[in-house]
Amino acid sequence: MDKRTLPSRLAAAGATLASLVAPSGAQAELKPGDTAPVFTAPAALGGKTFEFSLAKALGRGPVVVYFYPKAFTKGCTIEANRFAEAQDEYQALHATVIGVSGDDIDTLKKFSVEECRNRFAVASDADGSIMKAYGAVMPLLSSYAKRVSYVVGTDGRIAYAYSSLSPDEHVPNTLAALREMAKR
């Protein structure tokens, strides 16, 4: 191999890898102050299906919209259990919690009972439109959501955003954000 072509080949390989890691059309996550995209979606609570409406939920108070990759996987189960355990705290802050994933509604009916413990709803975003609108599509796996939590204020704007693959801090961080909002 000619030594002069090695740098250009490495540059081409790097560009190819970069295009795979950051697919075109990927959107950035929303930031505080951004308008939250309004959505309706099929959802499940306690094994029963209904149509969740962000606009209607915001009429009752702030909404925690949390995205998770896949029902019944280890991290997503841990996160759902933690949101379920904290529901009394969310309710005391007049907040609604809705989990969103690309899972089908039949899977979420079961997940809403077994892991969400009948305490909060989970919505199906099978076509990925909600994940895309919120910048929550997982790179390379577009049918999966990134683990991102948003607190949406009653004004329809993102009040808080937190992104971490770990499920550990989503509940405490969103509760802290809601407590700060309640002080205002």
Where are these regions (language model features)?
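A short beta-strand-turn-helix
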Residues: T40-P62
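Structural micro-motif
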Residues: N118-F120, M138-Y150
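N-terminal export leaders
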Residues: K3-A12
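Structural microenvironment flanking redox-active thiols in thiol-disulfide oxidoreductases
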Residues: T77-C116, G128-I130
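N-proximal helix/coil linker or "cap" segments that precede and/or mark the start of modular domains
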Residues: L10, L17-A43
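Short active-site neighborhood of thiol/selenol oxidoreductases, capturing the structured segment around
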Residues: L54-N81
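Thiol-/selenol-based redox modules, centered on thioredoxin-like
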Residues: Y144-R184
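Short loop/turn microsegments at loop-to-beta-strand junctions
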Residues: P37, P62, K146-V148
